[in-house]
Amino acid sequence: MTIKEIKELLKGDVSEEEIANLEKDSRSGVQKLLISYRKKQKKLFEKKQAFLERFLYEKQFWQKGQLVAGVDEVGRGPLAGPVVTAAVIIDQDFDLLDVNDSKKLSPEKRLKLYPKILEEAVSVAVGVKNAQVIDQINIYEADRQAMAQAVNALDIKPDALLVDAMNVPVDLPQIELIKGDAKSNSIAAASIVAKVFRDKLMDDYDKIYPHYGFSRNAGYGTKEHIDALKQYGPTHIHRKTFAPVSDFFK
């Protein structure tokens, strides 16, 4: 086989016998390909192991024949736009290895995973609370209510919740996990759904309010955003109780 043919071979499923034969090949190009192949296989193995470890909390419920939903939020800190939450129920067949804390993933990776999560999950729902609600009841309570909204919108009722460091005001057993989106695939999937959903909302708002850069900053207080606030003032989606937006209402 040529080096090029071997390179193509190693991109697919390779048997131990084929690897053993390649190890006997004295060509330096072949040995370099094998070194690269082993590194990739090691990385893939470690990725699979980490993925399986993130089912630790889900398994506690699956073993009892119960469904558990992961719940997470995005958008607590921005000066503009809603807080968005997601509730996601997955089962033992869920196999999207790239699912992880949404903050660790590129926007492109999140966009690719979003439809796959919707397809593979048992049930997915989203909760949204806008700037007016946030200003009325504070961001923490708005966050909790949005989480409850997402859980109640699931078309299948879960037996319990895994939540990223929050308590959801619903009558269900809950496990609160600090940095839960890095410890549970259910919460990680919810973090991706919430993030992509909110980013799409902010892209839409960017078309309505083009001066603030919402499609780039998602409502966070970047220099571009603050400069636009100073020049144009706050919009309908700005949070009046968040500084420096609140300065415009004194």
Swiss-Prot record:
Subcellular location: Cytoplasm
Record text on cofactor binding: Manganese or magnesium. Binds 1 divalent metal ion per monomer in the absence of substrate. May bind a second metal ion after substrate binding.
InterPro entries, sorted: RNase_HII, RNase_HII/HIII, RNase_HII/HIII_dom, RNaseH-like_sf, RNaseH_sf
Matching Gene3D superfamilies: Ribonuclease H-like superfamily/Ribonuclease H
Single biological process term from Gene Ontology: mismatch repair
Binding site for a divalent metal cation: D72, E73, D164
Cofactor(s), by name: Mn(2+); Mg(2+)
Ranges of residues in domain RNase H type-2: 66-250
Enzyme Commission code(s) on record: 3.1.26.4
Catalytic reaction(s) noted: Endonucleolytic cleavage to 5'-phosphomonoester
Main location: cytoplasm
Gene Ontology MF term list: manganese ion binding; RNA binding; RNA-DNA hybrid ribonuclease activity
Any one GO CC term of the record: cytoplasm
Keyword terms of this UniProt record: Cytoplasm, Endonuclease, Hydrolase, Manganese, Metal-binding, Nuclease
Broad class of enzyme this protein falls into: hydrolase
Primary role: Endonuclease that specifically degrades the RNA of RNA-DNA hybrids.
UniProt-listed PANTHER family: RIBONUCLEASE H2 SUBUNIT A, RIBONUCLEASE HII
HAMAP family named among the record's database cross-references: RNase_HII_B
Similarity field: Belongs to the RNase HII family.
Name listed for the protein in its UniProt record: Ribonuclease HII
Organism: Lactobacillus acidophilus (strain ATCC 700396 / NCK56 / N2 / NCFM)
